[in-house]
């Protein structure tokens, strides 16, 4: 049974993986991802990030994401822990861990869950910078990552989409 937790408290990777594996000799692979707060985003220094969520709705959305992964891959178990509240650079934000009999399924499912979570999980992020507070929009690159799994969304703002398109063109110009 997958575990979903939304919490303010930090988590211990070693303890969480040990709990996921305990008493399950059929597990041949565990893949995990930890996301952390960066000290810079979109060219501005970030001193703090505040994550908000809608209790109940967020956990249900995360459970649906994990269920989608469980249907796509032969997983033994999965774990998602997402922190909320005020976080500082280097703090852990999210842990995604999946257990399977084989590494290929574990890696793919872990990446799928994280791609899906970045675009579809109902969290709201506010960053504190030297210029003041700003809300963080969904990124077009996150939507592109999710689209490779056959899931199309439109959560990124038009401004974010235009900026990503301009960045893509600039990269093409540099590569030419």
UniProtKB/Swiss-Prot annotation:
<keyword id="KW-0501">Molybdenum cofactor biosynthesis</keyword>
<comment type="similarity">
    <text>Belongs to the MoaE family.</text>
</comment>
<comment type="pathway">
    <text>Cofactor biosynthesis; molybdopterin biosynthesis.</text>
</comment>
<protein>
    <recommendedName>
        <fullName>Molybdopterin synthase catalytic subunit</fullName>
        <ecNumber>2.8.1.12</ecNumber>
    </recommendedName>
</protein>
<feature type="binding site">
    <location>
        <begin position="102"/>
        <end position="103"/>
    </location>
    <ligand>
        <name>substrate</name>
    </ligand>
</feature>
<comment type="function">
    <text>Converts molybdopterin precursor Z into molybdopterin. This requires the incorporation of two sulfur atoms into precursor Z to generate a dithiolene group. The sulfur is provided by MoaD.</text>
</comment>
<comment type="subunit">
    <text>Heterotetramer of 2 MoaD subunits and 2 MoaE subunits. Also stable as homodimer. The enzyme changes between these two forms during catalysis.</text>
</comment>
<dbReference type="GO" id="GO:0006777">
    <property type="term" value="P:Mo-molybdopterin cofactor biosynthetic process"/>
</dbReference>
<dbReference type="Pfam" id="PF02391">
    <property type="entry name" value="MoaE"/>
</dbReference>
<feature type="binding site">
    <location>
        <position position="118"/>
    </location>
    <ligand>
        <name>substrate</name>
    </ligand>
</feature>
<feature type="binding site">
    <location>
        <begin position="125"/>
        <end position="127"/>
    </location>
    <ligand>
        <name>substrate</name>
    </ligand>
</feature>
<dbReference type="GO" id="GO:0030366">
    <property type="term" value="F:molybdopterin synthase activity"/>
</dbReference>
<feature type="binding site">
    <location>
        <begin position="36"/>
        <end position="38"/>
    </location>
    <ligand>
        <name>substrate</name>
    </ligand>
</feature>
<dbReference type="InterPro" id="IPR003448">
    <property type="entry name" value="Mopterin_biosynth_MoaE"/>
</dbReference>
<keyword id="KW-0808">Transferase</keyword>
<dbReference type="InterPro" id="IPR036563">
    <property type="entry name" value="MoaE_sf"/>
</dbReference>
